[in-house]
């Protein structure tokens, strides 16, 4: 009887260890952006120079397993008031009523609907982008690669080109271009 009790206890410990190993695997699929990451956009001003903007407050998450990228998803919420600009003199105009209208629409959001695996760490991430209360489909050309020095980190480069007028922003305002290049550069860290 003593032998059976020991066997049962060993089996219980093994089952517990296997369960915790499984939980660890689930957490390995949840990712958050590191503080070093940049989420922002570029837009031409007066047809000549490029204005760069960065969201300094971004909430994000990603569920991703490189063995099953078709099941991946990501979601971003970007605070419009947190934007900083390479040309600060344009901030009020870009955040004003004719463009972002940040006083009324505090956040911009992106929610993925599909990850298309193109091979070699390249993906098209399809989803819904909401700016100024207007939602449109957008595809981000994305590269996700394991970080060479940290197995819990993936390097990311991602971009999408949109027409700002598709999101209710007025055309021809103050020499600000129609095309906006949205970019994400940085790292995802396993949560």
Where are the regions that the model predicts?
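Bacterial N-terminal signal peptides that target proteins for export
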Residues: 2-13
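N-terminal signal peptide c-region/cleavage motif recognized by signal peptidases
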Residues: 21-23
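Cleavable N-terminal signal peptides
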Residues: 14-15, 26
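Low-complexity, acidic/polar, glycine-enriched regions of mature
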Residues: 26-191
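Short hotspots in intrinsically disordered terminal tails
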Residues: 1-2, 188
